[in-house]
């Protein structure tokens, strides 16, 4: 949901209102962060599986909003997005997009590490380990939970901006429930408590889905003469 908010808000600001891409890199994550802040209110008393269902439900709301505001978003038909422009240079090639994203991934990891080592990060970890113990230690649960949603929205919105402008086209199909499941798998594979683990988990899943699965799919299709699409889904699921 936050990824979609960042992507669409940046695309609309840059291409329809003439906002510079560099400024949208600041404004769009803030908008996504505010959406995270809003969803944090009903989620304050929810934990575990129900919290996950709540955030997924919010994703459906965002999708309906995108379709409803078709004057700006073009609804489910999708939206063409301009290439990113920084310092007067338009970034178009795949390699340039790669280095742009890589640069901001490094920045995100550094910022994430700084947050994790700060007072805010220690409060997050205390709440994760035990809400009762954290509250007994004087940590304001509501405050830090809301802050966690805001920061999550910031990071996801930032990623949405990069996704939109390096993909050149976005639609509601890009932000379905499967994408959320992919993100969860990436974090679980790498380790939910480690920033570097999340990065490694992402690399593993991306390589698995785009390199190893197609290779195995072709071999199994040749051996057993089954449908290639079914094989790819089966291999990735395993």
Predicted segments, located by residue:
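Transmembrane alpha-helices and adjacent helix-loop boundaries
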Residues: 1-238
């Amino acid at each position: 949901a936050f990824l979609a908010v960042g992507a669409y808000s940046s695309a609309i600001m840059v291409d329809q209102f003439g906002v510079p891409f560099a400024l949208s890199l600041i404004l769009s994550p803030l908008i996504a962060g505010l959406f995270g802040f809003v969803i944090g209110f009903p989620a304050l008393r929810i934990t575990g599986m129900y919290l996950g269902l709540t955030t997924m439900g919010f994703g459906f709301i965002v999708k309906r909003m995108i379709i409803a505001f078709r004057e700006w978003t073009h609804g489910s038909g999708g939206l063409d997005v301009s290439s990113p422009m920084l310092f007067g240079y338009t970034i178009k090639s795949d390699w340039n997009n790669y280095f742009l994203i890589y640069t901001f991934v490094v920045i995100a990891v550094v910022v994430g590490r700084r947050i994790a080592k700060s007072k805010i990060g220690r409060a997050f970890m205390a709440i994760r380990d035990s809400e009762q113990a954290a509250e007994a230690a004087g940590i304001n649960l509501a405050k830090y939970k809301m802050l966690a949603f805001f920061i999550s929205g910031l990071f996801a919105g930032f990623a949405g901006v990069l996704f939109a402008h390096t993909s050149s086209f976005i639609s509601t199909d890009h932000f379905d429930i499967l994408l959320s499941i992919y993100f969860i798998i990436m974090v679980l594979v790498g380790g939910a408590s480690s920033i570097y683990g999340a990065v490694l988990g992402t690399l593993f899943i991306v390589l698995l889905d785009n390199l190893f699965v197609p290779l195995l799919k072709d071999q199994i299709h040749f051996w057993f003469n089954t449908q290639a699409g079914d094989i790819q889904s089966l291999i990735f699921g395993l």
